[in-house]
């Protein structure tokens, strides 16, 4: 009599954010099925949870076209090898975590071999290159989506999708401790405080920092006690920001922070930020915000033709209306940015209404995503 094989889940994560999601999923699955086996491409967090790494996650974590081209042969070799080895292993379910350019083709290859496939984290198909939805539909048995409007998009195309809530919404409290964050950053409780977040990429910091600093100078005229906090993701971005500040606003006193973006948001009365995940995090920190963004004119021209949504920031996409002010391209200039931020720093009716809506949206996407994802995997495995 042969011993029954344990539940076997294959996973591929391609970057740190995927490693965090994968570790949370493995943890939730082990609580339900303690003897389950996990194999695939994993980072340190997934490996710490017991995932057997056939390849290290760093192998897939390449950014930019030039870097990808330089590594293309290796990436194609890894994908072909995984197709073969997973095909032989026949896991109960394959979970591709983000990394859509690598994972969706792999999912399609495995599905053809009769393996059930899940794509965890929807690519932004609802915003641009919408035809990708058909490839995703052919390659996967189920998409796990963080946001409710993503599920609505897949439903329109009859692609099975489950809204599981957002892990960031699970990790952040509904009512953040503003005074606690100010203690950490050394900001007086009674001061007005503004967070500047000019982005995590070099091009964004280059394009936005000068206008963000000039905006802060204008606001300081109205609020002389204004404390300005600037969290920067790494030493390179800090150096870049300091260079721009020396040229544009050498006398403006600011608190430069290494990381600590979340603390800066929680501590602040308002934030001026580039779009992206930071806007969602800022919403969850209950910090009223203005989104300012600029890109090269040709890139913007192209984006306007490709992007199919009315808004660029996640709070507005979640609310289905302009909840936070978005000032893009030529609109992203100090006078307009300052005018949009002034009522938020006043901490009056506008701020309180925004705060209340942020809290409602937080509750909508706070669904214990790790548990929901684990449940979806087990249901598909049956």
Swiss-Prot record:
<keyword id="KW-0444">Lipid biosynthesis</keyword>
<dbReference type="GO" id="GO:0009245">
    <property type="term" value="P:lipid A biosynthetic process"/>
</dbReference>
<keyword id="KW-0443">Lipid metabolism</keyword>
<dbReference type="GO" id="GO:0008915">
    <property type="term" value="F:lipid-A-disaccharide synthase activity"/>
</dbReference>
<dbReference type="InterPro" id="IPR003835">
    <property type="entry name" value="Glyco_trans_19"/>
</dbReference>
<keyword id="KW-0441">Lipid A biosynthesis</keyword>
<dbReference type="GO" id="GO:0016020">
    <property type="term" value="C:membrane"/>
</dbReference>
<dbReference type="Pfam" id="PF02684">
    <property type="entry name" value="LpxB"/>
</dbReference>
<dbReference type="GO" id="GO:0005543">
    <property type="term" value="F:phospholipid binding"/>
</dbReference>
<protein>
    <recommendedName>
        <fullName>Lipid-A-disaccharide synthase</fullName>
        <ecNumber>2.4.1.182</ecNumber>
    </recommendedName>
</protein>
<keyword id="KW-0808">Transferase</keyword>
<comment type="pathway">
    <text>Glycolipid biosynthesis; lipid IV(A) biosynthesis; lipid IV(A) from (3R)-3-hydroxytetradecanoyl-[acyl-carrier-protein] and UDP-N-acetyl-alpha-D-glucosamine: step 5/6.</text>
</comment>
<keyword id="KW-0328">Glycosyltransferase</keyword>
<comment type="similarity">
    <text>Belongs to the LpxB family.</text>
</comment>
<comment type="function">
    <text>Condensation of UDP-2,3-diacylglucosamine and 2,3-diacylglucosamine-1-phosphate to form lipid A disaccharide, a precursor of lipid A, a phosphorylated glycolipid that anchors the lipopolysaccharide to the outer membrane of the cell.</text>
</comment>
């Amino acid at each position: 009599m042969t011993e029954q094989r344990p539940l076997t889940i294959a996973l591929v994560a391609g970057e740190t954010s995927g490693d965090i999601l994968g570790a949370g999923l493995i943890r939730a699955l082990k609580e339900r099925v303690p003897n389950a086996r996990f194999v695939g491409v994993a980072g340190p967090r997934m490996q710490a949870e017991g995932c057997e790494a056939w390849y290290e996650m760093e192998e897939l974590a390449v950014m930019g076209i030039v870097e990808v081209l330089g590594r293309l042969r290796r990436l194609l070799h890894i994908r072909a090898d995984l197709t073969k080895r997973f095909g032989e292993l026949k896991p109960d379910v394959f979970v591709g975590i983000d990394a859509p350019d690598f994972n969706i083709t792999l999912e399609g290859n495995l599905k053809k071999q009769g393996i059930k496939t899940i794509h965890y984290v929807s690519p932004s198909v609802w915003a641009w290159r919408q035809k990708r939805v058909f490839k995703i539909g052919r390659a996967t048995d189920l998409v796990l989506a963080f946001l409710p409007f993503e599920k609505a998009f897949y439903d329109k195309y009859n692609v099975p999708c489950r809204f599981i809530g957002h892990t960031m919404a699970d990790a952040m409290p509904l009512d953040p401790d503003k005074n606690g964050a100010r203690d950490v950053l050394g900001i007086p409780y009674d001061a007005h405080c503004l967070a500047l977040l000019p982005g995590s990429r070099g091009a964004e910091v280059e394009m936005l920092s000068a206008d963000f600093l000039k905006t802060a100078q204008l606001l300081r005229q109205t609020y002389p006690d204004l404390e300005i906090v600037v969290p920067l993701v790494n030493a390179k971005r800090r150096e870049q920001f300091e260079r721009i500040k020396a040229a544009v606003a050498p006398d403006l006193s600011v608190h430069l922070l290494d990381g600590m973006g979340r603390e800066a948001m929680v501590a602040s009365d308002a934030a001026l930020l580039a779009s992206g995940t930071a806007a969602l995090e800022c919403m969850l920190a209950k910090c009223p915000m203005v989104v300012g963004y600029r890109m090269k004119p040709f890139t913007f021209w192209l984006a306007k033709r490709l992007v199919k949504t009315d808004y660029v920031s996640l709070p507005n996409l979640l609310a289905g209306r302009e909840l936070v002010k978005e000032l893009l391209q030529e609109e992203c200039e100090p006078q307009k940015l300052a005018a949009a931020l002034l009522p938020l720093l006043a901490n009056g009716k506008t701020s309180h209404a925004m705060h209340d809506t942020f809290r409602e949206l937080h509750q909508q996407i706070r669904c214990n995503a790790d548990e929901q994802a684990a449940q979806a995997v087990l249901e598909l495995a049956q």
